[in-house]
A protein has these predicted regions:
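Low-complexity repeat regions of mature extracellularly deployed or surface/particle-associated proteins
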Residues: 1-155
Length: 155
């Protein structure tokens, strides 16, 4: 189920066929849009999202054929946009603290895995996994500079 403590939270959730989203939001000024859609296709999506803190913006889409699984643990001020779409099985495990901006797309018929563990100062990550072959990416980073960034394209 969905558990929200705090105030000024905007949550929009749309699910279709075999969807499971466990969402826990604590704090204020959080916005979450989750759309797990298969429409007439078969399969399942899974999302486990925990948000603690404030000023968080999430947009998570898991669409169409293939199992998509997402774990997301957020603490602090973060912007996260995730698209897991296409026919392949895709997996993401994201853990964030402090100020981070993520833009992640996993698409194509390949089975893609991504794990991002970020802490420290502001980090901007753009990860694109779009291929018919399987792609894996792992990043564990503690940003000690004023800001850090990475752009990764696997196709």
């Amino acid at each position: 189920g969905i558990d929200i403590d705090g105030n000024s939270n905007d949550v929009d959730i749309t699910q279709n066929l075999n969807q499971s989203a466990l969402i826990d939001i604590t704090g204020a000024s959080n916005t979450l849009n989750l759309n797990q859609t298969h429409l007439s296709n078969t399969g399942e999506h899974y999302a486990d999202i925990t948000i603690v803190g404030n000023s968080n913006v999430m947009d998570i889409d898991q669409t169409e054929t293939g199992d998509k699984i997402l774990f997301l643990d957020v603490d602090g001020s973060n912007n996260v946009t995730v698209d897991q779409k296409g026919t392949g099985d895709h997996f993401l495990d994201i853990s964030l603290t402090d100020s981070h901006t993520l833009d992640i797309t996993q698409d194509g018929s390949g089975d893609h895995n991504g794990t991002l563990i970020l802490s420290g100062n502001n980090t901007s990550i753009t990860l694109t996994q779009d291929s018919s072959s399987d792609q894996n990416y792992y990043l564990s980073q503690n940003c000690t500079n004023t800001s850090c960034s990475a752009t990764v394209t696997q196709n």
